[in-house]
Amino acid sequence: MNSPELVIVSDTPYTVIDQPTEWISVSKDIQLAARLWRPDITVPVPVVVEIIPYRRQDGTLPIDERMHPYWAGHGVATLRVDLRGCGDSDGILEDEYLKLEQDDAIAVIKWAEKQPWCNGNVGMTGLSWGGFASLQVAARRPKALKAIIAIGATVDRYNDDVHYKNGCLLNENFGWGTSLTAFTSRPPDPSVVGKKWRSMWLNRLENLKFFAAEWFQHQTRDDYWKHGSICENFDAIEIPVMIISGWNDLYVNALPALMDNLKGRCHAVCGPWAHHFPHLGTPGPSYDYLGSSLAWWRQWLSDEPARLGTEKTHLTFIKDSSMPNPFVMTVAGRWIDDQTWPLPSNTMSHLYMAKAGLTSKAVDAPPVQIHSPVDTGAMAGEWVPHCSGAEVAGCQRLTDAQSTCFDGDILDQAIDVFGCPEITISLQSNSTTGHLIVRLCDVAPSGSSELISIGVLNLTHRNGNENPIPMPVGETQSLQLRLDYAGHRFLPGHKIRIALSTAYWPFIWPAVENPVLTLAKKPACLSLPGRQKQEEGSVQVNPPIAPPASALTEKRVPQSKRQVTHDMHQGKTSLTIRDDLGEVVFEAHGLVTSAVKYESYEITAGDPLSSQARFGWEFEYSRDDWAVRTVTETQLMCDHYYYFLTATVRAYEQGKQVFERTFDHKIARMC
């Protein structure tokens, strides 16, 4: 499902040589499998590397073929590499973002620069994992790496990824841990690795990691999370960085962080899309990402690259107020092209929580309480939505009704919010633990409520994420919380709303207790960054382009279901999700793949310790008389003191079970 504005382009200046498998030795006994696209010319050209764990033969092939051939056809070679232990590559995947992974990437870069078709200049790119890796490897400074493009990435693995956020345990920590375990249970392709496919597969299964269990061992911002977090030393990156995200993506905060802290050239782009490449993402509108990225590669990877500078530029889509619709394919707004950073015309407005709502007058907050039902947030969508649809946050009215809300006056003129909103608040708690969730919403005249930004805090992390401190019961504590990066125009007739809650389930695993928080008689302030000259820098952008879609035959149509149910007798709320990703035949090599993911969450009213989560994946691969299947099932439960994690992985060949392993972990909880 792509943006309706996407333009298909087939012609390129150069014929492309497509080499489906190139073997790259990164150590004595480990070879990584790669796909190489390069222009059919005799002149050496630059090369861009993307190294990720998602299987180039099938997993990302439909995306790869709508990006890499375009660059190659315009004179920039590309390598799409399977990570160690993934796809057709040798070895075992031990964890995310290890130094070993970075070493492998550096070895690939060194290999690439020495090829006769390469001019010695290498770029690195990727979405999500590949974006993280690009930033991390750039900080290692391999000589041949001259520029990167990171999409949907983070500079802080603890606070701005899927694991934790300000001390709050994200349910995606367990969900993504399940997915990564399931992903690494899959076999290599016999058509690529030959007869050793089975021994490689069984070796992977026997050494399989239950990644979530490791991540649950690190509930504070310790050295585990500091490794690979670029924010620990921004100065380590000296090459030009293009950083891209979307307002409907989790990974927006890397943009201002890199723009504010890198000493060298940085270009940031933020549009309305979710967690995807911008030319393929929704909702739109998007821009010509492939043309823009090609110009970036040419600028920094040519035989005579541009002079390194310190310029900071930012292309931003400022979205207009609209009726919340998760399924919309394009939204209203305008593109802004800022050629300086920070913006000289930035403003900061302040609104205070008062008995009548939000006011510009600095007054003490009323002594209202914040105490939300434990299932507050059940209709909120996904933490990391990938496209338009039920994953994207919809109307917030139901969640607002379970929260303590403060509304501003009806606006008589438009107000732009651009930057990271902040809230300063003083409160008391009746518990030593708990969460505070703050949402910034746009309320339309009809009463619909649109989510603009969110901030979350484990109250024991109010003084930092490394050494939690229990909340003192009944004592006033002053807090400052930064919300996520936002770009939004509140239109006349709308209202600004701040919504406060103590729960946001199932996004956030409940704290041990669901506290009653009471605002103290002190000013509670919402600070909104904006633009003084709202129309300054408005531009028209070229529409997104992409090569034609891959040759696939659909045998089973993808289908997604998402249901929230309330058991009135037991007081139980359940969320069930089933994502059938369909069954397809890859015409290029005949592989048939099928994938189904399912999730379920439940919680009982008034009992935060009743929260449960179950996840599962089923993968099937076949070709001719070869057929394999893997099934992964996991469960998360808790009590006052521990998390209980279980997982079972089964593997089948020709319908016969050939492997089974069960994991069972009891982990002391700190959050």
Would you name each region that the model predicts?
Residues 4-6, 283-652, 656-671:
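C-terminal, loop-rich substrate-recognition/catalytic regions characterized by aromatic stacking residues
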Residues 64-65, 73, 139-236:
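Accessory cap/linker subdomain of secreted extracellular hydrolases
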Residues 116-128:
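Alpha/beta-hydrolase fold nucleophile elbow
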